Amino acid sequence: VDTSDQPLQELAARLPDCAPDLVKPNSVELGQLCGIDGDSLESAATRGQFDDVVAAARGLHGIAEVIVTLGGTGALLITEHDAWHAWPEPVEVKSTVGAGDSSLAGFLLARTRGDQPENCLRAAVAWGTAAAALPGSTMPTPSQADAIHVSLTHL
C-alpha cells in the first residue's frame, strides 16, 4: 500500500484485520497511520534517531514489512524482528515527484529477483534517489538506479 490522507486513515482503522503485507509511507504518512506527528519522526531520523520510527512501524499490527522513506536521509525497512537503514550518497535533487513510487518499484523489483530484505531496501533507496535526480516525473532506468551508491546498516 502506498497512499495518504483519508485512504490511509481508513486502513489504519481496519488494522490488523485488513493488514496488507507491505506499506511504504513517508514520515508524514506514518504519522497519519499511527496518530503521531510525522514531522517530528522525520526530524529525529534526520539526526540519526530512528527508535521512534521503528516503534511506530512495529505498532502497525499485522503488517509484515514497513518501508519508511525519509527523503535525503534514505529509508528504513522494519519487520517484526529486524530493522535496517539505507541511505544514498548525496545527489542534486531535481524533482521529488515519483521518487516514492520509484522506491517502491525498486523494492518490488528486487523482491521478485529473490533478494534478501536488506538488499530490497538498498534497491528501493537507489531507485528513489535516481528518480529524485531526474527532472519532473521522469522514471529512472535500471542503469541510473544501479549507479547510485547506497550504504546500509542493521539497527
Model-flagged regions — what are they?
Residues 1-3, 24-25, 67-69:
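General beta-strand structural signal in soluble alpha/beta enzymes
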Residues 17-28:
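Non-cysteine beta-strand/loop elements that form the S-adenosyl-L-methionine
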Residues 9, 13, 17, 37-155:
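Conserved phosphate-binding/catalytic region of the ribokinase-like
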Residues 28-35:
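Active-site rim beta-loop-alpha module in soluble metabolic enzymes
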Residues 1-2, 8-10:
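Loop-centered beta-sheet repeat module
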Residues 5-7, 29, 72:
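Active-site-proximal loop/turn and secondary-structure-junction residues that shape catalytic pockets
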